[in-house]
């Protein structure tokens, strides 16, 4: 008998809250240099102290928890080949349109399912409308952790695909950024009969090659980069040279950094806060927004250290991987899934347009003058607008999901 989803309520124990308060009260902070720009060295001491103080005294997790519980949260179990059953937490917002388009939204690190929340009201009743499924990936949020080694991109993709199948969505479309880019690309490689189209806001691609993409290679050779593309290459170079140290640590020795993330809320705060600042386009974070994002990691079912293991497993190919959609493979041509690209100037990887078009049959592109890495949070109107244009009656992906145009109105559907 296959498992069925059940409603889920986020409920952090009083003991966990007390433990957080005790750890914050006992925190030891480092000194810092007398530098004019503290951000060059990492998260500034004054900012981290302010946030830690707010987290200990003034921040209302119970209020944030209640807000998260207003979402249609569910829990189910999926089985991934070679691993023990996994408890998957997910948000499942169903539109009133009976034939709404099933959309799988996949988050990354240091994001979570919370990133979908601003999209939900825009996609529920739009034209077209979407049934939105936003899981906490295994090792993230309120999904369970993976205890065995070798849980690679193939297995993250399998978990998400099996969730969609369990919900009755034999065909669906996807949206993702950060690890959501890689996971949804892996889904397109593994399950092209089910994944009909993808929209991504992280664009990890390489220059077109004559043998693989002759027309794109010719365009790349003949036409100079635009000013926006030159700025994008500068942004990409900045990230590689000045912003990617976390990546090297997490993809080589995730366990080592895990001790700090699991034991010290201040370490977790500084580690993530730096990214929220550096990876956005001057987004006006409130302190409570930041603390809610970080609290989801601190109170996560598997613990904050588990989330960084995806970096290691994605590049160390496991004997359990049979399809092998590695990071390298996901950055190459995927033939069977129509693709939409959203370009933002402060994304971490901003390659020239011809590079992005090497990823697959690109049928839709948008370019926004402002925005960064967390597009669904910074620019929800852009992401929702892209999806509605891409799948509209005049869009390139109209009726791409069999029997689900997104337009007809029916009785309120039930899970």
Where are the predicted features?
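The serine-hydrolase catalytic nucleophile loop
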Residues: 109-121
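Active-site loop/oxyanion-hole signature of alpha/beta-hydrolase fold enzymes
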Residues: 97, 137-179, 205
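Glycine-rich "HGGG/HGxG" loop immediately N-terminal to the catalytic nucleophile
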Residues: 63, 114, 128, 137-151, ...
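Conserved hydrolase catalytic core segment
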Residues: 122-129, 167-229
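C-terminal subdomain of alpha/beta-hydrolase-fold enzymes, centered on the catalytic histidine
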Residues: 250-415
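Non-catalytic accessory segments flanking enzyme active sites
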Residues: 17-94, 99, 289, 298, ...
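Short beta-strand element of the alpha/beta-hydrolase
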Residues: 100-108
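Alpha/beta-hydrolase
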Residues: 3-18, 28, 196-296
